């Protein structure tokens, strides 16, 4: 183990024997850290720093935290410390598939580090000796994370709408269609009703803001481009999308001259920036590339992707 990748987390009090045993069951699991330096305390470990003092279920806030925190692998547990290996972009690592619920991994797939959407209790360790609860993320195949995010957002969008207009939709029907993820023929419950909505609401605020700005930033030259591409044998989809443009957009794009070049260039630059921002929201980071997976001992060799 390289010296600069080793992180020692000191406990305030000695761990009880049963706590050591529970933590040893998590050896090989991914652990988020608030800081990156080599000596830390328990208050910087796990998902608790993302939530403050109260351990709620704000999974969107946890997602944001996981995309910026330091990730490490739990290697060793003693009565007064945890030893971890920090994950960097240029290393290869051994991790274990010890998460709840269990999702089958395979060689040559990408897995995603995400909040414990399915079962928070089974992915946490209560350390009464230190008055601390270690809440860990789960690591699942990326398609699982994609579907989970899709359904969390859909549920929260409908929840927000029905809070303003109670008759807009039946939340029981919405919940029935969004409260699970299907993988390899199995259904896994998401427990959406128990989710805190503040983080999701802030997430939706950002999403709506960026989408509105992007519409406003659409350069008039881009709108004109759709009409100038009109030709014999064009792609049929192009004509379909052309009819979707509002008339006022076409009117605004009617006149192109030297005075419109700089504003359009500025808009394109801003449009690229907001597209990148939206991409950062939905890129399911952080991700790991699994090169080999051994089902017998649940061990995987992987490296950090993003």
Curated annotation (Swiss-Prot):
Its main location: virion. It comes from the Viruses. Belongs to the herpesviridae TRX2 protein family. GO terms for molecular function: structural molecule activity. Interacts with TRX1 and major capisd protein/MCP. Keywords: Capsid protein, Host nucleus, Virion. One of its GO terms (cellular component) is host cell nucleus. This is Triplex capsid protein 2. The lineage of its organism: Viruses, Duplodnaviria, Heunggongvirae, Peploviricota, Herviviricetes. It is found in: Virion; Host nucleus. Structural component of the T=16 icosahedral capsid. The capsid is composed of pentamers and hexamers of major capsid protein/MCP, which are linked together by heterotrimers called triplexes. These triplexes are formed by a single molecule of triplex protein 1/TRX1 and two copies of triplex protein 2/TRX2. Additionally, TRX1 is required for efficient transport of TRX2 to the nucleus, which is the site of capsid assembly. InterPro entries: Herpes_capsid_2. The keyword DNA damage does not apply.
